[in-house]
Amino acid sequence: MWVLTPAAFAGKLLSVFRQPLSSLWRSLVPLFCWLRATFWLLATKRRKQQLVLRGPDETKEEEEDPPLPTTPTSVNYHFTRQCNYKCGFCFHTAKTSFVLPLEEAKRGLLLLKEAGMEKINFSGGEPFLQDRGEYLGKLVRFCKVELRLPSVSIVSNGSLIRERWFQNYGEYLDILAISCDSFDEEVNVLIGRGQGKKNHVENLQKLRRWCRDYRVAFKINSVINRFNVEEDMTEQIKALNPVRWKVFQCLLIEGENCGEDALREAERFVIGDEEFERFLERHKEVSCLVPESNQKMKDSYLILDEYMRFLNCRKGRKDPSKSILDVGVEEAIKFSGFDEKMFLKRGGKYIWSKADLKLDW
């Protein structure tokens, strides 16, 4: 018998099993393909589950959309702190006499328009005090004619407004809001809304007529405090028929009407939440009433001071940003403390153009 070498023996053995092994491999190939596909699908499913469980806070920064900048839809521009009244609870007092040059104020208003502003509200202080209302009138006309803002409004105590102002600028103004805290003249004097022999309530009625004559929507603002919280104003408000009656709860702001550096001491005017709610309940039949508690006031207004700085009131004081004239609107508004959700919740966005109000003049 022939004796085979190891190499020859291995070759002979391979030739014997080649066909069976080939057949076995062909039968196993589909199984291997199926197993590979199955494991790939399982791994993919596991990765997706892990992404879901991670949540939005654990996603990669590069996959997150950056937060959208706040849009200054409605801005309150307190261009002056000077006033001819001495309301005891005033929360924007005469701490400076500064007023921007007219062209600088216009530049700032243009920046706000470019950032998305739709409504501008001019306030103070008393806005009609500067240049006998001419400074204000020119800003009103600029905002309506050149910036084409849907809404231009003013908040005033009404004591310095003359009919000639309506003749010159009334067509450019959408809403005039007059501050009136009481229909009892003695209470007005006690609060600080008095000026010699002038009657605040009689002047209010005259302004209502002018607004009707010159097609300006009429609004009333009232601050509810210790001296008027028990008053019933239902009949008087209904007779004046404003488009809105804003009812504010007396608010303390450190450095303005309370604290060491304050020019007012408003603590004696403050009322509790329950007292404020009782006042609202007493006037629930007044359809134009728009209530605003302290919390809504602090967080839901974009307030611009005389230097065009946004004021953050969230901590019970006014912390200013840098001026929009220096850093732009998008950067300054980051420090405004503005709560857009609260702004919408309190009804901050409403029909505010007199063209859309469809009033019966």
Curated annotation (Swiss-Prot):
Its EC number is 4.2.-.-. Gene3D superfamilies: Aldolase class I. IRAK1 and TRAF6 synergistically activate RSAD2 increasing its activity with CTP as substrate about 10-fold. It is found in: Endoplasmic reticulum membrane; Golgi apparatus; Endoplasmic reticulum; Lipid droplet. InterPro entries: Aldolase_TIM, Elp3/MiaA/NifB-like_rSAM, RSAD2, RSAD2/Viperin_antiviral, rSAM. Its main location: endoplasmic reticulum. It catalyses: CTP + AH2 + S-adenosyl-L-methionine = 3'-deoxy-3',4'-didehydro-CTP + 5'-deoxyadenosine + L-methionine + A + H2O + H(+). GO terms for biological process: CD4-positive, alpha-beta T cell activation; CD4-positive, alpha-beta T cell differentiation; defense response to virus; innate immune response; negative regulation of protein secretion; negative regulation of viral genome replication; positive regulation of immune response; positive regulation of T-helper 2 cell cytokine production. GO terms for cellular component: endoplasmic reticulum; endoplasmic reticulum membrane; fibrillar center; Golgi apparatus; lipid droplet; mitochondrial inner membrane; mitochondrial outer membrane; mitochondrion. Acetylated by HAT1. HAT1-mediated acetylation of Lys-197 in turn recruits UBE4A that stimulates RSAD2 polyubiquitination leading to proteasomal degradation. 'Lys-6'-linked polyubiquitination at Lys-206 leads to RSAD2 protein degradation. Induction: By interferon type I, type II and bacterial lipopolysaccharides (LPS). Little or no induction by IFNG/IFN-gamma is observed in monocytic cell lines. Induced by infection with hepatitis C virus, yellow fever virus and Sendai virus, presumably through type I interferon pathway. Induction by infection with human cytomegalovirus (HCMV), stomatitis virus (VSV), chikungunya virus (CHIKV), Japanese encephalitis virus (JEV) occurs independent of the IFN pathway. It is an enzyme of class 4 (lyase). Keywords: 4Fe-4S, Acetylation, Antiviral defense, Atherosclerosis, Endoplasmic reticulum, Golgi apparatus, Host-virus interaction, Immunity, Innate immunity, Iron, Iron-sulfur, Isopeptide bond, Lipid droplet, Lyase, Membrane, Metal-binding, Mitochondrion, Mitochondrion inner membrane, Mitochondrion outer membrane, S-adenosyl-L-methionine, Ubl conjugation. Homodimer. Interacts with IRAK1 and TRAF6. Interacts with FPPS. Interacts with HADHB. Interacts (via C-terminus) with VAPA/VAP33 (via C-terminus). PANTHER family: RADICAL S-ADENOSYL METHIONINE DOMAIN-CONTAINING PROTEIN 2, S-ADENOSYLMETHIONINE-DEPENDENT NUCLEOTIDE DEHYDRATASE RSAD2. Up-regulated in atherosclerosis. Latent viruses like HCMV may be involved in atherogenesis by initiating local inflammation. This may induce up-regulation of antiviral gene RSAD2, which modulates lipids synthesis, and thus could play a role in abnormal lipid accumulation leading to atherosclerosis. Belongs to the radical SAM superfamily. RSAD2 family. This is S-adenosylmethionine-dependent nucleotide dehydratase RSAD2. It comes from Homo sapiens.
